Protein backbone atom coordinates (compact mmCIF):
# COMPACT_ATOMS: atom_id res chain seq x y z
CA UNK A 1 0.00 0.00 0.00
CA UNK A 2 1.19 3.60 -0.45
CA UNK A 3 3.42 5.22 2.13
CA UNK A 4 1.56 7.67 4.37
CA UNK A 5 2.52 11.31 4.00
CA UNK A 6 1.56 12.66 7.42
CA UNK A 7 1.40 9.53 9.54
CA UNK A 8 -1.37 7.01 9.79
CA UNK A 9 -4.08 7.24 12.40
CA UNK A 10 -5.44 3.96 13.79
CA UNK A 11 -9.04 3.11 14.67
CA UNK A 12 -8.51 4.42 18.20
CA UNK A 13 -7.50 7.82 16.83
CA UNK A 14 -3.87 7.31 17.88
CA UNK A 15 -1.00 7.89 15.47
CA UNK A 16 0.48 4.64 14.10
CA UNK A 17 3.29 5.79 11.78
CA UNK A 18 5.83 8.60 11.66
CA UNK A 19 7.06 9.36 8.12
CA UNK A 20 8.44 12.69 9.32
CA UNK A 21 11.30 10.94 11.18
CA UNK A 22 12.90 9.43 8.06
CA UNK A 23 16.42 10.87 7.75
CA UNK A 24 16.61 11.92 11.42
CA UNK A 25 18.81 10.44 14.10
CA UNK A 26 17.31 7.52 15.99
CA UNK A 27 17.38 9.57 19.21
CA UNK A 28 15.43 12.46 17.65
CA UNK A 29 12.94 9.98 16.14
CA UNK A 30 12.40 8.37 19.56
CA UNK A 31 11.75 11.80 21.09
CA UNK A 32 9.12 12.64 18.45
CA UNK A 33 7.42 9.24 18.64
CA UNK A 34 7.26 9.36 22.45
CA UNK A 35 5.67 12.81 22.28
CA UNK A 36 2.86 11.34 20.15
CA UNK A 37 2.72 7.93 21.88
CA UNK A 38 4.10 8.20 25.43
CA UNK A 39 3.59 4.48 26.18
CA UNK A 40 5.54 3.35 23.10
CA UNK A 41 8.10 0.57 23.47
CA UNK A 42 10.57 1.76 20.84
CA UNK A 43 12.96 -0.73 19.26
CA UNK A 44 15.80 0.71 17.15
CA UNK A 45 17.02 -1.96 14.74
CA UNK A 46 19.08 -2.09 11.52
CA UNK A 47 16.99 -1.80 8.36
CA UNK A 48 18.06 -5.25 7.16
CA UNK A 49 17.40 -7.06 10.47
CA UNK A 50 14.57 -9.49 11.09
CA UNK A 51 11.70 -8.03 13.10
CA UNK A 52 9.35 -10.03 15.31
CA UNK A 53 6.19 -11.10 13.50
CA UNK A 54 3.90 -10.86 16.52
CA UNK A 55 1.94 -7.59 16.60
CA UNK A 56 2.30 -5.40 19.69
CA UNK A 57 0.23 -2.17 19.60
CA UNK A 58 2.64 -0.47 22.02
CA UNK A 59 5.81 -1.34 20.08
CA UNK A 60 7.25 0.98 17.43
CA UNK A 61 10.10 -0.18 15.20
CA UNK A 62 12.61 2.51 14.19
CA UNK A 63 14.58 1.04 11.27
CA UNK A 64 17.98 2.66 10.84
CA UNK A 65 20.94 2.76 8.45
CA UNK A 66 24.36 2.50 10.12
CA UNK A 67 22.67 2.44 13.56
CA UNK A 68 22.00 6.18 13.55
CA UNK A 69 19.80 7.48 10.71
CA UNK A 70 16.15 6.49 10.32
CA UNK A 71 15.78 4.66 7.00
CA UNK A 72 12.06 3.87 6.75
CA UNK A 73 8.73 5.08 8.09
CA UNK A 74 8.45 4.09 11.76
CA UNK A 75 5.25 2.17 12.50
CA UNK A 76 3.38 0.55 15.34
CA UNK A 77 3.72 -3.20 15.36
UniProtKB/Swiss-Prot annotation:
<keyword id="KW-0646">Protease inhibitor</keyword>
<comment type="function">
    <text>Inhibits both subtilisin and chymotrypsin.</text>
</comment>
<dbReference type="Pfam" id="PF00280">
    <property type="entry name" value="potato_inhibit"/>
</dbReference>
<feature type="site" description="Reactive bond for subtilisin">
    <location>
        <begin position="24"/>
        <end position="25"/>
    </location>
</feature>
<dbReference type="InterPro" id="IPR000864">
    <property type="entry name" value="Prot_inh_pot1"/>
</dbReference>
<comment type="similarity">
    <text>Belongs to the protease inhibitor I13 (potato type I serine protease inhibitor) family.</text>
</comment>
<dbReference type="GO" id="GO:0009611">
    <property type="term" value="P:response to wounding"/>
</dbReference>
<dbReference type="InterPro" id="IPR036354">
    <property type="entry name" value="Prot_inh_pot1_sf"/>
</dbReference>
<keyword id="KW-0722">Serine protease inhibitor</keyword>
<dbReference type="GO" id="GO:0004867">
    <property type="term" value="F:serine-type endopeptidase inhibitor activity"/>
</dbReference>
<protein>
    <recommendedName>
        <fullName>Subtilisin-chymotrypsin inhibitor CI-1C</fullName>
    </recommendedName>
</protein>
<feature type="site" description="Reactive bond for chymotrypsin and subtilisin">
    <location>
        <begin position="53"/>
        <end position="54"/>
    </location>
</feature>
